[in-house]
């Protein structure tokens, strides 16, 4: 698969290992015109959570983050390394054109999209994209680590296990609209949940499972043959980061 001269592809991404994995995979199949990395907004996200969820829930989430940083991250690394063996999850700097921005909704991104007029914009790990940005390209495609519409938001695989629905652990490739993972579904790919999985290994499995589906979606969009569908069999719900008690319940579900 490859792009012709008038079929520009831009990637909007966060700086993390899984975004690198997707970017490098797509770069093997397509000519990537530009990669735009959005800076993290930790303080802004914390303020949003406090307003949306309340101090008690946020305190539980922060307690979980401490456990994640001190324990889960380290324990998960060997399995993640095995999963990523044979794949390139290194930063694409020096190999692809890179632009660092504070926000995907800022002036630099607006100017870049207006200038390059991409046929497809791939999204991985950024914040919500404004309507005015979405109007600058015909197709925005997102990779989401959850089966929508049931697991919108973050950590969809985690929440599927938490609810006792490992059959709904998987990845959704979908068109981007102004909502939170509410765009029309292009493809959904399930994963196999194992008893030794963790909060951190599930997203790795979800990205790996959907790499080919994303490539197919991008090619279909370039060819003008992209098709979508909706799932009316699943209730729609947005999920947030887990609290420590919720993580402990997740661990019990895995056993």
Predicted regions: what is each one?
Residues 1-255:
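One-carbon transfer enzymes
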């Amino acid at each position: 698969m490859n792009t012709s001269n008038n079929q520009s592809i831009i990637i909007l991404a966060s700086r993390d290992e899984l975004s690198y994995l997707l970017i490098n995979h797509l770069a093997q199949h397509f000519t990537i015109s530009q990669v735009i990395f959005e800076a993290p907004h930790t303080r802004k996200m914390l303020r949003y959570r406090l307003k949306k969820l309340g101090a008690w829930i946020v305190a539980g989430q922060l307690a979980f983050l401490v456990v994640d940083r001190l324990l889960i991250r380290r324990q998960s690394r060997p399995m993640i390394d095995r999963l990523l063996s044979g794949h390139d999850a290194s930063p694409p700097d020096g190999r692809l054109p890179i632009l660092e921005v504070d926000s995907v909704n800022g002036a630099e991104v607006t100017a870049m999209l207006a200038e390059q007029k991409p046929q497809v914009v791939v999204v991985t790990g950024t914040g919500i994209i404004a309507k005015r940005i979405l109007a600058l390209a015909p197709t925005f495609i997102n990779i989401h680590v959850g089966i929508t519409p049931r697991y919108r938001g973050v950590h969809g695989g985690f929440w599927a296990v938490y609810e006792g629905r490992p059959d709904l652990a998987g990845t959704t490739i979908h068109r981007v609209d102004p909502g939170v993972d509410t765009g029309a579904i292009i493809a959904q790919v399930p994963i196999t949940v194992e008893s030794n999985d963790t909060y951190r290994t599930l997203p790795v499995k979800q990205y790996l499972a959907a790499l080919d589906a994303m490539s197919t979606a991008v090619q279909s969009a370039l060819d003008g043959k992209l098709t979508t569908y909706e799932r009316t069999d699943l209730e729609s719900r947005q999920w947030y980061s887990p609290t420590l008690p919720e993580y402990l319940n997740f661990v019990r579900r895995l056993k």
